[in-house]
Every structure is written in C-alpha cells, then in structure tokens.
C-alpha cells in the first residue's frame, strides 16, 4: 500500500459565537496551503467556538452555522485540499456535535460525536444528542475514522472504526 495523505492541522483558537470570523480564518489558512496538502483539519466545534453552552440552542445561530459551512463547501470547488471541520448541526429536532468532511464542493460525510461528556463546563449531554456509532470515511482512496474528542477513549467507538 503506497497511498499517502498530507494533512495540515489548523490549531486555531476560534471565538465562541463568531461563526463568520471563524470561517473566514479557516478559508484564509486554506488559501495559503501548498497544493500538495490533501486535507485541512480544524478542531471540534471550530465553526461555533467551544464551549458553546446555550448559544447552540438558538435557531438563528444554527442557521448561521449552516450558511457559513456552505462557504467552506464553495471554497473546496477548486479541488484542492479537503476540509474536516467541527460544528454543531440540527438533525430533525436534535442538535449534534458533528464533524463535516468537505471535498470538491460537497459535504461528503457528516459524523456525530458519540461519547458526550457531562463534567464541569462540558455540559454536552444536556445540549447535544448522542450520535450513532459511525463508520469510517474515505478521502483520496484512504479510509480512516473520525472520533471526536472523548470518542477516542470509548472502546466501542474505536472497535467500530478499526
């Protein structure tokens, strides 16, 4: 197997609630990447900032997140690096802590966080609906898992992705 991916990690500090500013920063970073970078990865809940608390319960905020994610979709139409980015999303009547995989002008996959913490400022069980155990995603012919934060410590999640 000679397949390889070049991945850039965007270790950015998003501002909670500054959805447009966070997206602009990520698009700017992506525009400066070398053409040989296959994937740009941003942190959990990067789009909204974290910890998000009750802001994510507002319908207008979730609508803004959705419209700003579309800007990321549009910028990937250049067929350069894919983007993996964390954002809250509305799924029917529930809100999920998700990761979006965006490539070639499309959202090719959405994965939801399974293991929601409920300690201190991490009040995710009150805010988010638990995701299901997710399968792997494939980018450029390479299959890999996308556990989100505490999912890494959950044996059930890792077994599903292995």
Language-model-detected regions and their locations in the chain:
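Enzyme catalytic cores with a strong preference for nitrogen-chemistry domains
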Residues: 1-162
